[in-house]
Amino acid sequence: MLNVKEIFEYLPHRYPFLLVDRVTEFKSGESLKAYKNVTYNEPQFTGHFPDNPIMPGVMIIEAMAQCTGILAFKTQDVKPDGTSMYYLAAVDNCRFRKPAIPGDKLEFEVKTVNNKKGIWKFECTTSVDGKLIASCDMLCAERKV
């Protein structure tokens, strides 16, 4: 549905911090599905951990947050023009059930819980091979840049 070049239109993130490879499904105001292919060539694996590479949990959270930004902007049918962006405001009930490693395809699903005055609440999950590896509730706030 959205390839990486199209994702650039909704997120300010670029290498090495763009953590969404493709959006596969979008339901306006409701949900978004996307994925990221984890590869050993990514810079975080030089230190986390060279002999046992594991995707840092905070990067999985960030990837889910990037998905929420795409969902919010697309729901409003707005492409950011540099005057506002969505900031991660809170993460609650975060759980990591299994580590993500190089070779995994992280499958994200973010669902809108509510939106009031530019503050969005989402339920977020990450799965690998259909098995849940991470979940959280997230608040994102639209702010002027």
UniProtKB/Swiss-Prot annotation:
Q: Looking at its record, which EC class is this enzyme?
A: lyase
Q: Which domain of life is it from?
A: Bacteria
Q: Where does the protein principally reside?
A: cytoplasm
**InterPro entries in the cross-refs:** FabA_FabZ, FabZ, HotDog_dom_sf
Which reactions does this protein catalyse?
A: a (3R)-hydroxyacyl-[ACP] = a (2E)-enoyl-[ACP] + H2O
Q: Where in this chain does the entry annotate a coiled-coil region?
A: none
Q: What is its EC number?
A: 4.2.1.59
Single Gene Ontology MF annotation: (3R)-hydroxyacyl-[acyl-carrier-protein] dehydratase activity
What GO terms describe the biological role, i.e. biological process, of this protein?
fatty acid biosynthetic process; lipid A biosynthetic process
Record keywords: Cytoplasm, Lipid A biosynthesis, Lipid biosynthesis, Lipid metabolism, Lyase
Q: One GO cellular component from the entry? A: membrane
Any one Pfam family match given in the protein's UniProt record, by short name: FabA
Active site per the UniProt annotation: 48
Q: Where in the cell is it found?
A: Cytoplasm
NCBIfam families under this entry?
fabZ, PRK00006.1
- Which HAMAP family is this protein grouped with? FabZ (MF_00406)
Task: Give the record's family classification.
Answer: Belongs to the thioester dehydratase family. FabZ subfamily.
Q: What is this protein's function?
A: Involved in unsaturated fatty acids biosynthesis. Catalyzes the dehydration of short chain beta-hydroxyacyl-ACPs and long chain saturated and unsaturated beta-hydroxyacyl-ACPs.
Protein name (Swiss-Prot/TrEMBL): 3-hydroxyacyl-[acyl-carrier-protein] dehydratase FabZ
